[in-house]
Regions:
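Histidine-acidic metal/acid-base catalytic patches
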Residues: 1-27, 98-100, 157-179, 184-283
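Active-site-proximal loop/turn and secondary-structure-junction residues that shape catalytic pockets
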Residues: 10-12, 38-40, 66-69, 106-110, ...
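Catalytic domains of carbohydrate-active enzymes, especially glycoside hydrolases
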Residues: 20-40, 90, 96-100
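Residue-level detector of anion-binding/catalytic polar loops
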Residues: 32-33, 59, 100, 143, ...
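Active-site-adjacent beta->alpha loops and helix N-cap segments on the catalytic face
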Residues: 42-52
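Active-site acidic/histidine proton-transfer and metal-coordination neighborhood
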Residues: 55, 77-176, 261-265
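Hydrophobic residues in well-ordered beta-strands that form the structural core
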Residues: 60-62, 103, 146, 179, ...
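A short acidic, helix-capping loop that chelates divalent metal ions and anchors anionic groups
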Residues: 69-74, 110-116, 153, 186, ...
Length: 283
């Protein structure tokens, strides 16, 4: 069975010792690992977290974003250099916490739009930054799992077809892709077609309901999602990503204006749901 993870953004975007009791409880539920947002905390906070999760017997994955001032598709070479520097910094923090995967939409600035569709030059610019960053990540055996977002958050990569184009532009074995059921539920015609498209470079999966609440409680076609993952013989992480207003600054940044589900309801029922669906579909 695939490893099951939980993204602690349901509680906070900050990596700190305050997460220790939450992570212990997630371990008790049965999770194989936890996922952290790579925010501006000191290296020592990540190192303590890395030691703590290792001692608990939990693996880790990480997620990051970039914005207007460190946008890999900016026309400004200075801004693109800041993007490269930030991704390298994230690699160091991921290494501190023992993560071998950095996922997320760090190919372009989150909610940065230019009032036109993406152009080939922008894929080339992002690919250049990601290729250089991946050379650095490879030294720590870290893989990038790039994420396509819905049209309201990103214009460079909304679909698996666009994401595959970006991965090819980066042209590096450590640059791969991820699949998020929330975004794909908005942008793709069918999960099966989307997953067949991205299968050759798929490295990570986020299990996320249409309303960002408890998986299985909403409108996502979960049988299609899990059967399609089984059809491509996916063997990576199945990590729940759900949000709340527990961290107001982060919630405001991603447009979370109300509570969807209690985080522990998400964690407990979501874990059971993933196991049931995985067994049902032979994943």
């Amino acid at each position: 069975m695939n490893k099951i993870g939980f993204n602690v953004l349901a509680w906070t975007a900050a990596v700190s010792d305050d997460l220790f009791p939450i992570i212990e409880r997630l371990k008790g539920i049965g999770y194989d690992g936890v996922e952290f947002y790579l925010g501006p905390q000191e290296a020592s906070a990540y190192q303590r977290m890395g030691n703590f999760t290792k001692d608990l017997g939990l693996e880790t994955t990480t997620v990051m974003t970039v914005g207007k001032d460190d946008n890999p598709v900016s026309e400004s070479a200075e801004v693109r250099q800041r993007a490269l520097d930030k991704i390298k910094w994230a690699v160091d923090r991921a290494h501190d916490v023992n993560s071998k995967i950095i996922c997320g939409p760090f190919h372009s600035g989150h909610t940065v739009f230019v009032n036109r569709p993406a152009e080939d030059r922008e894929y080339a610019l992002a690919g250049e930054v990601l290729n250089a960053a991946a050379d650095y990540a490879a030294q720590a055996n870290i893989t990038f799992a790039l994420e396509a977002l819905n049209r309201f958050e990103c214009y460079l990569c909304n679909t698996m077809e666009q994401l595959l184009k970006l991965v090819k532009a980066a042209d590096h074995p450590n640059v791969r892709a991820m699949f998020d059921t929330h975004h794909s539920n908005i942008e793709e015609k069918k999960f099966s077609t989307a997953l067949q498209t991205i299968a050759p470079v798929l490295a990570h999966v986020h299990i996320s309901e249409n309303d960002r609440g408890t998986p299985g409680d909403g409108q996502v076609l979960w049988d299609d999602a899990f059967s399609s993952l089984a059809a491509i013989k996916y063997q990576g992480w199945l990590t729940i990503e759900a949000f709340s207003r527990n961290d107001p600054a982060f919630a405001n940044a991603i447009g979370v204006w109300r509570e969807f589900s209690d985080p522990w309801d998400i964690a407990e029922n979501g874990y059971r749901f993933i196991r049931e669906m995985s067994l049902k579909h032979g994943l």
